[in-house]
């Protein structure tokens, strides 16, 4: 009993001493100044993507569209308003995936500081694009080809494969014209066609509008494009694919860019078993470039991600369709990344990266001075921008010769 009293006395004395020391000395935590709107914005706004400076967009865009959406994502918005807009089931699904925070990520006072920082430091109007340099292509003669048979206004695919001209519209009708015999036929598919490679046809699912529903599908046709079989369905708004052996079984697999909406992914469908493997889980997967980068005989690939954290990544294959991602170029969320390709433009034996960034259909619809075509060179394993040509709403870049 006596020992117990001694222990209690010692413990009490220890607590009193610790309390005295805490009150006597100024610890950094107790004297830390309140964070500014700029500091808070860098803390929270850079947690999901590259940090956007206020100056990149005009004040009315920040105030009327971007800041309200940021507020909703951080759990400070009116949940009833969000639910009425996207539906209860969709809201719960997105909250579970971390798109919308159910509990506030910061205090209301902190949010007001962020809001004020962006509004006070953003320009009243967007910056104009720089004057374009004159080139011979601007004075060349281009013949416009009109598809007079296409009654539906929204064309989702246009391409020539061997001697067949193929078009598709928003209704999911695939029209095939033999350029030799001039014979035509059409095939009805579940949804609009967005990509065709060899005899494989990719359908986006739904009606082209953004959705979380997984309605996309991949179909394999015969040589005449009359009969087809379903390869895989329940794809999340797929927009591009490659048909290539990724696991060394001599059977081609399907590498699919499931663009999605709030969520999305890059997936591989085994050509033999048709089993699906998820390679990356980010929205906005746009297109691929296949390359054996390290010359080990395994097919690697580059991929462009155009939503949230916009970037171009290199995925190295271990030979069994397991990939390691390395981000080679990172872009802010307002960049508008749209498409990319690799090509040796200056005949030096090394490929340059050509990129179009002009997507302007989300929360910041305004003319942007930084939209256009960019060229990056691989300089000592680092990609550096060496050329920019401003073009509003640029969505795709090509490298070819247009000569008679």
Q: Model regions: which residues?
A:
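Hydrophobic membrane-insertion alpha-helices, especially the h-region
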Residues: 9-22
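Positively charged n-region of N-terminal signal peptides that target proteins for export
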Residues: 1-6, 241
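Aromatic-capped interface at the extracytoplasmic side
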Residues: 25-28
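Beta-propeller-forming repeat regions
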Residues: 30-39, 43-404
């Amino acid at each position: 009993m006596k020992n117990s009293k001694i222990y209690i006395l010692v413990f009490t004395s220890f607590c009193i001493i610790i309390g005295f020391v805490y009150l006597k000395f100024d610890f950094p935590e107790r004297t830390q100044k309140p964070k500014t709107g700029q500091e808070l914005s860098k803390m929270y706004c850079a947690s999901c993507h590259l940090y956007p400076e206020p100056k990149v967009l005009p004040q009315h865009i920040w105030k009327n569209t971007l800041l309200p959406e940021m507020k909703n994502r951080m759990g400070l918005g009116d949940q009833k308003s969000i639910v009425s807009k996207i539906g209860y089931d969709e809201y719960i699904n997105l909250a579970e995936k971390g798109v919308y925070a159910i509990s506030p990520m910061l205090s209301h006072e902190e949010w007001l500081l962020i809001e004020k920082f962006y509004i006070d430091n953003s320009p009243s109007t967007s910056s104009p694009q720089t004057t374009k340099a004159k080139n011979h292509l601007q004075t060349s003669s281009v013949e416009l080809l009109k598809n007079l048979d296409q009654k539906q206004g929204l064309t989702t695919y246009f391409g020539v494969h061997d001697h067949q001209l193929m078009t598709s519209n928003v209704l999911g009708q695939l029209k095939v014209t033999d350029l030799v015999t001039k014979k035509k036929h059409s095939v009805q598919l579940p949804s609009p066609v967005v990509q065709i490679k060899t005899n494989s046809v990719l359908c986006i699912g739904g009606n082209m509008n953004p959705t979380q529903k997984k309605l996309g599908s991949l179909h394999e046709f015969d040589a005449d494009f009359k009969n087809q079989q379903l390869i895989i369905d329940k794809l999340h708004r797929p927009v591009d694919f490659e048909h290539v052996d990724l696991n060394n079984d001599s059977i081609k697999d399907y590498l699919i860019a499931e663009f999605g909406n709030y969520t999305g992914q890059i997936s591989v469908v085994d050509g033999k078993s048709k089993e699906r493997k998820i390679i990356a889980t980010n929205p906005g997967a746009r297109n691929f470039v296949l390359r054996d980068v390290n010359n080990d005989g395994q097919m690697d690939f580059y991929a462009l991600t155009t939503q949230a954290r916009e970037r171009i990544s290199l995925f190295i294959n271990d030979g069994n369709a397991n990939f390691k991602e390395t981000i080679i170029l990172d872009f802010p969320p307002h960049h508008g990344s749209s498409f990319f390709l690799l090509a040796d433009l200056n005949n030096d034996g090394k490929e340059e990266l050509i990129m179009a960034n002009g997507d302007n259909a989300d929360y910041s619809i305004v003319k942007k001075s930084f939209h256009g075509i960019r060229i990056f060179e691989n300089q000592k394993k680092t990609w550096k921008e060496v050329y920019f040509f401003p073009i509003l709403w640029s969505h795709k870049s090509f490298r070819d010769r247009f000569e008679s």
